[in-house]
């Protein structure tokens, strides 16, 4: 697994042993020239990630980006790889892509404190400040679902269910009135918590597979009131800037205009944006 890098304090921590400049040059040549792909051909995702770490530590952020992407392609999704890829994008000044990958890291592991800290750090640098468009209860629900990974919520549900079975056994087999009362009411509460944990576990799993959120990538993007380029000032909805997070609520393929997404921003404001100007998380 690639080691985690941090840019919270604008200074990266040490990573894996740095490859020699000659090795990095060979890797770069293999990536840039199809005829010379032997340096990276057949490498495992872990090896590619280690080479990416070395490139990052050598301040070769473009090569690090390419290697992290290849590591993801070969080895599959990883919260650490997305996190480190986000760092590589940040070092190139690509805040939009950095935010996308920090968000992806948190989708896979909501407990990734470094990714959360870096996401907050980069969000503080973008033009449009993030505004929660949901209600207080929506925020509480999202915070609860995102507290742990779906598997962790499933384990919590199993533990609670085991406690419920213990309370049920105490209620059935105990002859003491006080024990029966305590086990009945305690078991009822634990059963309700078990159901809640199961629901949250499914919601957390669905969140990982969901792609309803996206990030604006260009320095600025003019949103429209309809799924086409604004043809007059009245068709211009509002302007969003790189790094802004939007919620996709609809999509349409407009002949001659390409794919467009209807998005929700801020306090419930809706508008249409070109699909090519956002990247789904």
Report the location of each language-model feature.
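Boundary regions of SH3-family modules and the immediately adjacent low-complexity/disordered segments
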Residues: 95, 181-222, 226-235, 247-249, ...
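Membrane-embedded alpha-helical segments of integral membrane proteins
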Residues: 133-174
């Amino acid at each position: 697994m690639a080691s985690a890098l941090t840019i919270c304090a604008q200074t990266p921590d040490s990573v894996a042993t740095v490859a020699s400049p000659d090795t990095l040059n060979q890797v770069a040549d293999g990536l840039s020239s199809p005829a010379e792909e032997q340096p990276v051909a057949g490498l495992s995702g872990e090896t590619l990630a280690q080479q990416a770490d070395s490139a990052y530590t050598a301040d070769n952020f473009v090569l690090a980006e390419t290697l992290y992407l290849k590591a993801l392609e070969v080895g599959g999704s990883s919260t650490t790889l997305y996190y480190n890829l986000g760092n590589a994008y940040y070092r190139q000044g690509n805040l939009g892509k950095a935010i996308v990958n920090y968000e992806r890291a948190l989708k896979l592991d909501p407990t990734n404190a470094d990714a959360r800290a870096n996401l907050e750090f980069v969000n503080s640098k973008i033009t449009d400040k993030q505004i929660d468009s949901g209600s207080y209860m929506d925020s509480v629900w999202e915070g609860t679902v995102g507290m742990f990974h779906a598997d962790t919520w499933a384990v919590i549900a199993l533990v609670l269910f085991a406690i419920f079975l213990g309370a049920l056994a105490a209620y059935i087999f105990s002859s003491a009135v006080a024990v029966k009362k305590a086990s009945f009411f305690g078991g009822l509460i634990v059963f309700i918590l078990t159901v809640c944990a199961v629901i949250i576990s499914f919601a957390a799993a669905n969140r990982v597979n969901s792609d309803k959120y996206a990030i604006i990538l260009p320095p600025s993007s003019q949103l429209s009131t309809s799924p086409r380029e604004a043809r007059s000032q009245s068709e211009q909805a509002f302007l969003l800037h790189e790094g802004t997070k939007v919620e996709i609520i609809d999509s349409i393929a407009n002949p001659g205009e390409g794919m467009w997404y209807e998005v929700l921003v801020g306090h419930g404001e809706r508008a249409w944006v070109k699909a090519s100007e956002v990247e789904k998380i």
